């Protein structure tokens, strides 16, 4: 089976046919093929980004590009026996180990698992993350997931997508000069419409690295 990451443009610009990884870089405005690209991916929980974009992250990191994963919650609720700060501390350490294994940054924010809402406060956190990373590419879930934390992660990134260039909002962090390219992770949801990829990136050559990332999340996959 050919392993791949699929992505869908989050804006309403011209659609692209399915292309390989190098072509993804070519759609970035004002970017030469040999320039370093800065990618940031958002998930609701520690391990969400790994599942959605671990292969792409490993591939781009190996090519010298800069990649960061951000979990909007600290994962302090999703376990059979542990919970609270003890679990959050463990999940944060697992995420950082996952990032270390492929050479990317991994940040876990301190919002509570299962209680994420699309508030102005969290939207501003997302705007700061995108600006501080000086992102060229932003990846997030579509805002139609069954899980409210996943769904609201999509809403928050979608709401932040325009605001990252507005100078009079979140004034403690300089705005970007131009909008990044915003992409969605692939999914199997059919409402309001099925996912249709614009970009497909083969991850056959880095699939073992993606598995290694997931293996770091012991509390998520082995307990």
Roles of regions detected by a PLM:
Residues 11-27:
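Bacterial N-terminal signal peptides
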Residues 1-12:
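N-terminal secretory signal peptides that target proteins for export/translocation
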Residues 6-8, 19, 95:
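General helical structural elements
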Residues 32-133, 155, 163:
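Active-site rim/loop-helix segments in enzyme catalytic domains that contact anionic ligands
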Residues 2-3, 20-21, 28, 32-42, ...:
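Metal-dependent de-N-acetylase/amidase catalytic core
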Residues 10-14, 52, 200:
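Intrinsic disorder/low-complexity detector
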């Amino acid at each position: 089976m050919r392993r791949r990451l699929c992505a869908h443009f989050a804006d309403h610009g011209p659609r692209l046919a399915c292309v390989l990884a190098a072509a993804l870089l070519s759609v970035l405005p004002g970017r030469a093929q040999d320039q370093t690209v800065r990618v940031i991916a958002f998930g609701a929980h520690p391990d969400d980004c790994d599942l959605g974009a671990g292969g792409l992250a490993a591939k781009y990191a190996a090519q010298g590009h800069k990649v960061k994963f951000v979990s909007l919650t600290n994962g302090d609720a999703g376990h059979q026996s542990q919970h609270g700060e003890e679990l959050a501390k463990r999940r944060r350490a697992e995420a950082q180990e996952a990032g270390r294994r492929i050479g990317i940054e991994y940040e876990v924010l301190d919002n509570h698992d299962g209680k994420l809402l699309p508030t102005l406060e969290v939207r501003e956190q997302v705007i700061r993350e995108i600006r501080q990373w000086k992102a060229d590419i932003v990846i997030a879930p579509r805002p139609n997931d069954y899980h409210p934390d996943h769904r609201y992660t999509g809403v928050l990134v979608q709401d932040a997508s325009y605001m990252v260039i507005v100078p009079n909002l979140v004034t403690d962090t300089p705005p970007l000069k131009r909008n990044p390219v915003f992409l969605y992770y692939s999914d199997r949801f059919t409402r309001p419409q099925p996912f249709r990829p614009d970009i497909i990136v083969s991850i056959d050559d880095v699939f073992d690295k993606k598995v290694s990332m997931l293996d770091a999340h012991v509390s998520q996959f082995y307990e």
